[in-house]
A protein has these predicted regions:
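Stable alpha-helical elements in mature extracytoplasmic
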Residues: 22-25, 42, 73-77, 98
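Active-site-adjacent substructure of cysteine-protease-like catalytic cores
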Residues: 89-127
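Helix-adjacent hinge/juxtasegments
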Residues: 50-92
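Noncatalytic regulatory segments and standalone regulatory/sensor domains
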Residues: 102-104, 124-155
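Short, well-ordered strand-loop elements centered on a beta-strand within folded domains, enriched
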Residues: 41, 69-73, 127-134
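Short glycine-aromatic motifs
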Residues: 10, 55, 85-87, 96, ...
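Active-site-adjacent structural segments surrounding the nucleophilic cysteine of cysteine proteases
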Residues: 1-68
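Intrinsic-disorder/low-complexity loop/linker signature
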Residues: 10, 64, 70, 93-94, ...
């Protein structure tokens, strides 16, 4: 769970500031507590370690940014969730449509809102936003839910 941490916090890695919304959704859904300076440092370390392990893609073409296709993307949802965020879940690998009914066995739901770009948030089973890494982002305020990612409990 994030306490007092926003995606725009300057102590976070710039790549998290720009592309870390889904990553921060994992942190919010986690039973671990990320708070203050220590929490931001822990998140930066997790991002770096997960990138080294290939769970998150890095600067693929080595041009010094993460704005190219396939960069700063979570590639192994299950490993990231379980190894770094203590979430005992399994991603089904599907981008579910916004109008699909969420099964009762789903433990965690992340939604992708779209308006001038995409932004991930944590949803409850009624599809209401329970966490937005920017607080009240323009994408959520002005956009619409395009798809969902479902994570099932492992046990």
């Amino acid at each position: 769970m994030l306490k007092g941490i926003r995606q725009s916090d300057k102590e976070l890695l710039p790549v998290i500031n720009d592309y870390g919304c889904l990553f921060l959704c994992f942190a919010q859904a986690s039973p671990l507590i990320f708070e203050g300076k220590e929490g931001r440092q822990a998140l930066n370390k997790i991002w770096s370690e997960a990138t080294k392990k290939g769970y998150i893609s890095g600067d693929i073409n080595h041009d010094g940014d993460y704005d190219d296709d396939g960069e700063a993307e979570i590639k192994n949802h299950n490993a990231l969730a379980n190894e770094f965020f203590a979430l005992d879940v399994r991603y089904d690998g599907t981008h579910h449509k916004a109008d699909e009914k969420i099964p009762s066995k789903v433990k965690v739901v992340f939604g992708k809102y779209v308006w001038k770009g995409g932004h991930f948030v944590v949803l409850n089973k009624s599809k209401a936003v329970t966490f937005d890494s920017f607080g009240k982002s323009n994408t959520v305020q002005n956009g619409k839910l395009e798809s969902m990612r479902w994570y099932y409990a492992n046990s």
